[in-house]
Regions:
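Glycine-rich, proline-tolerant flexible connector loops at the mouths of alpha/beta enzymes
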Residues: 1-17
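Acidic/histidine-rich catalytic cores of soluble enzymes
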Residues: 83-175
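Short, contiguous strand/loop micro-motifs
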Residues: 1, 26-28, 64-66, 98, ...
Length: 175
């Protein structure tokens, strides 16, 4: 979930080339996209990917309707800029987007409804939706073609100690 280069001083391009792997997407933060869209698009192109994924907002109140509406607006703006450069913007969920913001709606509902499918689509993470108690199959059906990537991992049942604001239980290693 960290932007490239923030996880140590590794030569990611060389590592990827040496292993023959393909980069499906890169993660970026919304502020960087809005401040430096050309730089971000060039980075995506150097990895031969068409997807830039925003993995949520740090210290963001997903229970605040005005804030969520503003987020949708900013996502649309960033997505439009990226689309003009041949890149697609995806939003990756965690459990916090499923907090209620009003009458029967959660923040994720608002993001689906208020973002333009031409500019913003989704990398759906079923682990976090399940953690939030969401009917993941129904939500995947609702997203339909807007679900461009699917992030799947095993869901643990052990409770963990202190962690970030998102994590509530341990994930389990696949395999």
């Amino acid at each position: 979930g960290m932007p490239i280069g923030k996880t140590a001083k590794l030569d990611w391009k060389k590592l990827i080339a040496d292993t023959g792997l393909k980069v499906v997407s890169i993660h970026e933060d919304l502020g960087s996209i809005l401040r430096n869209p050309q730089e971000i698009m060039e980075e995506a192109k150097t990895f031969s990917t068409k997807y830039i994924v925003i993995t949520g907002m740090h210290r963001f109140d997903y229970s605040n309707m005005a804030a969520v509406l503003e987020l949708a607006q900013k996502l649309n703006k960033a997505g439009k800029i990226l689309k003009e450069g041949g890149i697609s913007l995806l939003y990756h969920n965690h459990n916090c987007e499923f907090r209620k913001v009003g009458a029967g709606k959660c923040a994720y509902d608002v993001l689906i409804e208020k973002t333009n499918p031409e500019y913003v689509n989704f990398e759906f993470d079923s682990y976090w939706a399940t953690e939030a108690g969401v009917d993941t199959i129904a939500l995947m059906e609702r997203l339909g073609e807007r679900m461009k990537l699917y992030h799947i991992n095993d869901r643990g049942t052990r409770m963990s100690g202190p962690g970030g604001q998102i994590l509530k239980s341990d994930s389990m290693e696949l395999g």
